[in-house]
Amino acid sequence: MDVKAASLVDAWNERVRRNPEGRALAYFDGSISAAELDQLSDAFAAALEARGITYGDRIGIQLQNIPQYVIAFLALWKLGAIAVLMNPMYKERELRHLIEDSGARGILADDSLYPATAAAAAGTAVEWILTTSGLEYQRRNDPRIFHSAVPAPSSPDGDMAAWIAEFAGRKPADRTLAHSDVALLAYTSGTTGAPKGAMNTHGNILNVAATCSAWMGLQPGDSVLAVAPLFHITGAVIDAATPLLADTTLVMVNRTDPAVVVDAFAEHQITCTTGSITVFNAIYQVPDAAAAHFASARTLYSGGAPIPPSTVHAFKERFGAYIHNIFGMTETTSAVIGVPPGVQAPVDPASGSLSIGLPLPNVTARIIDAAGNALPFGEQGELELSGPQIVPGYWNNPDATARTMPGGRLRTGDVATMDESGWVYIVDRMKDQINVSGYKVWPREVEDVLYEHPAVYEAAVVGMPDAYRGESVVAYVSLKSGHTATEEELIAFTKERLAAYKYPRSVYVIDDLPKTQTGKIRRRELRKTPKEG
């Protein structure tokens, strides 16, 4: 893969030229060659162009891991348009913020999501909502994934397959793109908890894809399984863009059912994948999973949530496959620190934590003090990162960009140490952000929902260690005088208003929340052993 390619489109065109008949996508029993994928994305790009979509326009994608996601990526990039990653689990209030902030002109959504997506888009700049079905591009209809073999009704605005069929054999106008052009808007959270759109450029993605391809030793004929969701930066870049541009096969299974993932490893002879520790924990619990399923696995990476050494050991003992740590952020276009393939990460003797790895090529990592000065090896400070993977900023948010990326160097907000060999260890987070299975949850957002309940007087949300998810969301509330509310009632209330990974798994009703003399809630005390008041 040539990182010097002018854009992702140029890199993709080179891959098609090298091996047009090579398998680019596998989806259950379906297969799409590079040439076929190129034609499908050409037709979709031409359809979008005919409807006025052009350079710089934003289009939301609200899908699971299905071939249409990749078709849309390539089509939008061919137009110089920007893909806005939208989580299919988002509820109306969450989705509406992404729509309004990005100024999306259109949305490609799963057909089952149309009613909720239409409600979120009402009164915004969205001109149309196009739908598609995960049943397409395969015939197996695995009942573990598909509960019905009949697609949901299409959007009144149209169906993706129909748009592609209408423009079959057509191409969009040629467009010259550069490394600095934005390819993705991937939303993260800022210090206030408000989601911000990180502007992942063609150059950012090319650099990460080229680095990861070389780092993982990807070869033509390898198969990479996308277990990380493509609406997450890791899924979009490492699990999708990297194999697509590296002349390997991207294997997709819609959503992560652990038994389906295990079967896919054997069926498609998976060599590499990157997912959260939750996925690997779930795989470990599959009764029939055996070492034979993972015989082809050469490189397994886990990112998002911390990975305990005991989990790595147990997986290696049972399946013969070692899980490597990898570290990245939306602002770093995914991976920037990782454990080299075939190398076992050291464990910090002081904390017992597994190293997240070494800085990848072209990445500069420093541990700094509050003034931005580099600290000696072994001292704790904030992890700062720089390199061609760092995004140029946040969409329409120069103030947050200046705070988080002064001089183009990313202040991660993570407390870390680095040893003399360059191994990095995460000690703690400077922020209150909660990591649930690799998904980021901000306490304030959950607290705001709790405050909508008529009985809640005060609320505080913290992350608690969870062997399965990495961390779980836990809430503490005090109630208004004369009001009552149960844990079950409050959980149900938040579950209706937040994505599945965001709502609290436990809610403790206590008399008073612990506070400082200035009235700030002492979250550290709440992270101790929970006690009901």
PLM feature spans:
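AMP-binding/adenylate-forming catalytic core of the ANL superfamily
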Residues: 90, 107-109, 387, 392-393, ...
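ANL superfamily adenylate-forming
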Residues: 116-179
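Conserved AMP-binding A3 loop
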Residues: 33-35, 174-175, 183-207
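Conserved AMP-binding/adenylation subdomain of ANL enzymes
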Residues: 206-223, 231-272, 280, 286
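Gly/Ser/Thr-rich phosphate-binding loop
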Residues: 270-274, 284-350, 364, 374
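Conserved AMP-binding/adenylate-forming core of the ANL superfamily
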Residues: 4, 21-66, 70-74, 91-96, ...
